[in-house]
Amino acid sequence: MALTVNTNIASLNTQRNLNNSSASLNTSLQRLSTGSRINSAKDDAAGLQIANRLTSQVNGLNVATKNANDGISLAQTAEGALQQSTNILQRMRDLSLQSANGSNSDSERTALNGEVKQLQKELDRISNTTTFGGRKLLDGSFGVASFQVGSAANEIISVGIDEMSAESLNGTYFKADGGGAVTAATASGTVDIAIGITGGSAVNVKVDMKGNETAEQAAAKIAAAVNDANVGIGAFSDGDTISYVSKAGKDGSGAITSAVSGVVIADTGSTGVGTAAGVTPSATAFAKTNDTVAKIDISTAKGAQSAVLVIDEAIKQIDAQRADLGAVQNRFDNTINNLKNIGENVSAARGRIEDTDFAAETANLTKNQVLQQAGTAILAQANQLPQSVLSLLR
């Protein structure tokens, strides 16, 4: 190698190596101080792109978890209100059964009905005031809401809540489309009544009548006999008129027939021309009737019996809605568990890409520190090489 003064190759080479070790030392210091292996795109362009995508997914999963928790809270709010509505309906049912009892006077039934009216208002109040985040849940305006429970678009769970006011809660039962009149007994005898509905059992009911009974007494006896038959039909006497109500779910095409047969004259013991109480057919068919909880009136025994049927159906409606809300809460719970699992694994993958390996980076730091110190010492010696030319000039 030529001995020159203007160009010090050894010094230039040492400077280059010293710059490289200094740059590596700065990189190690930055990685150790930030905890991140990728601090700019130049550190790992492809890794930066992948890590950013994974970061977006992790952030989305965290938001989705919060959204799912909001969904659980909303469902719990609605379900709690429906529990109270169920309690109210159970109380109304108790009052209806109490009113249906024959020991109650008209004034007692009126008092019982007064409490029912207050409970109807409370049902409406719960429906109108149950809110979550300012949004009403049970007044019918909620409809169906979608909860974003994923890190990508359109990963949703839909929750629907129906109206649960007293007016919307309804029950179906079958009411005879007409009433039958009963005439007073003119002779003692037996009234034979064939009663039943389609899809249910049918029985013959025999009612013994006395010759001196009024039409009202005869009607009460016939109604009691029908009720005792327990074939799913309720009979109610009002004066000399009998009306019928069938339980919800029974076929409305059924018919009731009431006819006098085999009348026996009490004083002769033989069949004759005298008649016991005359009964005209109460109904030839049932008409399907839909009543709401808001229309319940238990001021009469007949109304109380119908109220029980309506309330039973209303409780079924609420139970169905509560079951849906319970199911969606379980779904949200499972979704949250899955989101947490995904988030954990995605975070681990991102960490492997962008996090600093402190063991390896500390080793790099030590190496670069030694190289920098050595390079500085060697550079000092390299810079002294041109001075050797002076010995040739002496």
Swiss-Prot record:
PANTHER family in alphabetical order:
FLAGELLIN (PTHR42792:SF2)
Q: Please tell me where this protein is predominantly located.
A: secreted
Record-given protein name = A-type flagellin
Keyword Nuclease (UniProt): no
> Where is it found, in Gene Ontology cellular component terms?
bacterial-type flagellum; extracellular region
UniProt keyword list:
Bacterial flagellum, Glycoprotein, Phosphoprotein, Secreted
SUPFAM superfamilies linked: Phase 1 flagellin (SSF64518)
UniProt's post-translational modification comment states: Phosphorylated on tyrosine residue(s). Flagellin from strain 5939 but not from strain 170018 is glycosylated.
What domain of life is recorded for the organism?
Bacteria
The impact of changing F332I is: In strain: 5939
> InterPro entries given for it?
Flagellin, Flagellin_C, Flagellin_C_sub2, Flagellin_N
Family of this protein: Belongs to the bacterial flagellin family.
**Subcellular localization, as worded in the UniProt entry:** Secreted; Bacterial flagellum
* Position of the signal peptide: none
What does the function comment of this entry state?
A: Flagellin is the subunit protein which polymerizes to form the filaments of bacterial flagella.
Q: Which GO terms describe its molecular function?
A: structural molecule activity
The organism's taxonomy opens as: Bacteria, Pseudomonadati, Pseudomonadota, Gammaproteobacteria, Pseudomonadales
Pfam family for this entry, one: Flagellin_N
